[in-house]
Structure formats: C-alpha cells, structure tokens
A protein has these predicted regions:
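Short, flexible loop segments at boundaries between secondary-structure elements
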Residues: 179-194, 323-337
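Glycine/threonine-rich beta-strand-loop-alpha-helix active-site module
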Residues: 164-186
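Extreme N-terminal basic, low-complexity initiation segments
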Residues: 2-10
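Ligand-binding beta-strand-loop-alpha-helix segment within the catalytic cores
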Residues: 189-211, 215-218
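Contiguous, glycine/small-aliphatic-enriched amphipathic segments in soluble metabolic enzymes
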Residues: 15-172, 215-299, 303-328, 332-334, ...
Length: 368
C-alpha cells in the first residue's frame, strides 16, 4: 500500500507530526475490500461521543481509507445529527459488518437499540447510558476477536455512569483486558511529538508508587517496545522516567530507581532492547519531543498524561497495548459540559482512526 502525505500527519515510523484535519490519502485499488474495517463505538450516549463520531465521518477521506462501522443507537445518533448540522442523515443499518455499504454520506450502523433517549439525558450521568456504552465496547471487542473487524476505535465513556450500571472498570483498557483475557496491558498515548506508556494508570498515587516494581516496569518496557513495532518503528529507543525528583539523585530522594527500575532496565537490555537508565521526569519528555527517544515509560498516570495533554489536547490518541486486538481511542472524556452543543471537535477521533489504520497496516491484516 503506497502512502501519499498531505499536510502534517502521524505516519508509520518515527515521524510523528500530526494534523488530523489534513489526513493523508492512501493510494489503493477501487476494490472496497482493500480498506480496513473499523468498529467505531458511539461512546456514552449522554456525552460528546455521538457528535464527534458523526463529525469525523463527514470527512470523505475517512471512507477512502477505511470502512467505518458505527456501534450505537440510531435514536441517539439522530439526536446528535441535529446538533452537528446534519439533520436527516442517512443510516445504513446492518446486522452483519460484511453487509455494509461504507459510502460517504451514509453512516453504516450496527444498531443496538439499547439507549432510550429519555433514559440517557444529555450531559448527565445515568446507569442507562453507562450500560449502553459498555455494551458497544463488548460487541466491538467480540467482533474483533472473531476477525469480523480489523480494529476497534472507541469514543469516550463515563466511568461514573459505567460503575453506576454495575461495571466496575477503571476504563476501556481494563474492560478490554478482562473481555479478551489479556494478562498484561497498559496504556499508550500517541501525540504530535510524543509517545508515552504507563506503568500504572487509574489508581491513587500511593498505590501507583507501590506498583513500581521490577516485574511491572520490565513488563511495560516490553509493551513499549512491541507498541512501537506495531506502529512501524524498528529498533525503538525507549526512555524510562524515574519515579522521584531527579530520578532519585542517587538515592537522596527515594530508592525506587536503584531498587526496582534500574534492574528492570538492565534485564531489558540483556534481551537486546534499547533502553535508557531512569531519567529525571522533568526533562525526559522534552528530550523525547526533540527526537532523542521514540517512547517514554512513565511511572504513573499524571506523570505521562500532563505532558501529553499539554502538547496534544485535541489530537492525542489512547492505545490499549497488550491486547490480542487493535484498539485506539480519543484521549479525552465525555465532556458533559458541552454535550449537545455541537462544539466538540473530532480531531482526536480522526487521529485515533489514523493510528488504528497504521497498526492494521503494520500487522498486515484485513477483515474478509
């Protein structure tokens, strides 16, 4: 497959400049079966997910690059269509992904009819919306596991709504890990000039510190390596952030670097991986942005998320790594405060679609 760049974008390999509204076109045959099939979940019905899905799929280039299958509720999408200036939008409702038309101007939809609008008020947490959002992810995951779709791209769900519905997951990654039986997973963030993998994510800071163990750090270094390979980066250069200020300063400010992190680094090096010593957290991300490293292993959620949000608030992508399926997502939440206003931007979802397609291409697969 020949790639032609148009504008700045995230491409396979080390170049990571991305402008999601100037997505490059892919030279391919006219045969629609040459396009990867992506399952795109609608997200929480009460949030901005339905709006950004519809906005993203207004870009004709998306259909030239892939076959997007939306998993959601037609009633919610029709409600959102009026907010984003697309009243009367056509829906191609299917029961089987193989039956979809996947043409620009019509939304190919697997209609789960599980989100009655009256039970999913816009901008509000509800058990009905939380349950529906989880069911979209379950169905998309099952399709990917069965090989019926090439990858899963998720719009945001709301953790409070999800838990109110009885699903005690910290987020998409944990949900998908259980659904697929994946033993070791982590979160990869991909942004305009930075990639970050986390040792821990949605836990209290005290618990995050306890989770900085040699075994876990070594596992995440391995996940960082394989995630870069999945993005087409050969021989990735991996930076490892320290936990403490100045990476412990030789034990003056904490000993986790010498006791847990450095042994994990040495073990990874012994297996041929290109991994740095524990680096001062306040400078390692800048060095990665300047091109010295391909990915940074962050020790906890905010250590990795703060630089990513600063650099890529609208265009960051969340990738679940360690799963037997490809899953990417927007790097923002349900934004209840603007849901229903039509203001939500689709940039991050376009970026998530782009990264999913890169991973499918690197993996060399396409659904039927």
């Amino acid at each position: 497959m020949e790639l032609r760049a148009r504008g700045d974008r995230l491409i396979l390999g080390r170049e990571v400049c991305y402008n999601p509204l100037a997505v490059f076109e892919v030279a391919m045959t006219e045969d629609s079966m040459g396009r990867a099939l992506l399952a795109i979940t609608m997200g929480d019905p009460a949030g901005v997910g339905p709006e950004i899905v519809l906005k993203a799929l207004r870009h004709a280039v998306v259909y030239r690059r892939c076959r997007p299958l939306v998993l959601g509720d037609r009633r919610i999408l029709e409600r959102a269509a009026s907010w984003v200036g697309s009243p009367g939008l056509e829906f191609d409702v299917v029961d089987d992904p193989a039956a979809g038309r996947y043409t620009s101007g019509a939304i190919t939809l697997l209609n789960l009819t599980n989100a009655p609008p009256g039970e999913c008020p816009t901008g509000q947490v509800s058990a009905a919306a939380g349950r529906a959002a989880v069911e979209y992810v379950f169905r998309a995951c099952d399709l990917a596991m069965a090989g019926a779709v090439d990858a899963v791209v998720t719009a945001p769900l709301n953790k409070a709504a999800m838990n109110l519905a009885g699903f005690a997951y910290a987020g998409h990654t944990e949900l998908l890990a259980e659904r697929t039986g994946a033993p070791e997973v982590s979160m990869l963030l991909v942004g305009p000039k930075l990639r970050v993998v986390h040792v821990s994510t949605h836990v209290a800071l005290a618990e995050a510190i306890r989770r900085v163990t040699r075994a876990r750090v070594e596992t995440v270094i391995d996940l960082a390596h394989t995630s870069c390979l999945a993005l087409g980066i050969s021989a990735p250069r991996i930076a490892v952030a320290g936990l403490n200020p100045h990476a412990g300063e030789g034990g003056l400010f904490g000993d986790q670097e010498e006791r847990e992190i450095l042994p994990a680094v040495c073990s990874a090096r012994a297996r041929g991986l290109n991994v740095s010593d524990p680096q001062p957290p306040d400078t390692v991300f800048l060095r990665a942005v300047k091109g010295e490293f391909d990915v940074v292993v962050a020790m906890y959620h905010d250590q990795g998320h703060i630089p990513m949000k600063l650099l890529a608030f609208d265009s960051g992508v969340n990738v679940s790594i360690g799963l037997p399926i490809i899953r990417t997502s927007v790097d923002h939440g349900t934004a209840f405060d603007i849901a229903g206003s039509g203001q939500a931007r689709e940039d991050s979802l376009l970026a998530a679609i782009d990264v999913a397609l890169q991973m499918v291409a690197a993996h060399g697969t396409s659904a039927y």
